[in-house]
Amino acid sequence: MIGRIAGLLLEKHPPLVLVDVNGIGYEIDVPMSTFCRLPGIGEQVTLHTHFWVREDAHLLFGFMTEPERVLFRQLTKISGIGARTGLAILSGLSVNDLHQIVVSQDSTRLTRIPGIGKKTAERLLLELRDKISPAITLPETGTAMASSTDKDILNALSALGYNDREANWAVGQLSEGVTVSDGIMQSLRLLSKAK
């Protein structure tokens, strides 16, 4: 599986981008939320990716942040929501917007997205309701987990049974320069208070 792509941005044609990694060009589908934040042609870019295998195609989907990729994966597990619809949702709504929609059970905002009818919107809200806790707010889509300390803390929280959304939220609350052990302890305290 390809989880991350880092390389030179060669082309941008919505919704596709072409990224050169050591002489190999990867064509990646991205939501408009990611497309709008891409650097210029010829600059370095890093995308969190999801590798999608179908009978007729192998596709890469790219996201500027980990929370966007996590949400894309949750969306595409819902019956009736394929990869293209998942991209359309993330193109029209930020991670936090979708979180608020799920918490408030506001299906009308979802039906404004192309490809989402009333029944699909209601199914999406039903499926995501148990996965998104109202006590936990997701980090802004502009934040990215980049440091090795953050990754070590995320891995530890994952090993302790926390899902990606909870772990990313907790790490996003930590102060800069925290050690791995202190970060794990602080994250556990935050997560226990949020439940």
Swiss-Prot record:
Any single Pfam family the record assigns to this protein: RuvA_N
Keywords from the UniProt entry: Cytoplasm, DNA damage, DNA recombination, DNA repair, DNA-binding
Record-linked SUPFAM superfamilies: DNA helicase RuvA subunit, C-terminal domain, Nucleic acid-binding proteins, RuvA domain 2-like
DNA-binding listed as a keyword: yes
Domain-level remarks: Has three domains with a flexible linker between the domains II and III and assumes an 'L' shape. Domain III is highly mobile and contacts RuvB.
Family affiliation: Belongs to the RuvA family.
Name this polypeptide is given: Holliday junction branch migration complex subunit RuvA
Native organism: Nitrosomonas europaea (strain ATCC 19718 / CIP 103999 / KCTC 2705 / NBRC 14298)
Gene: ruvA
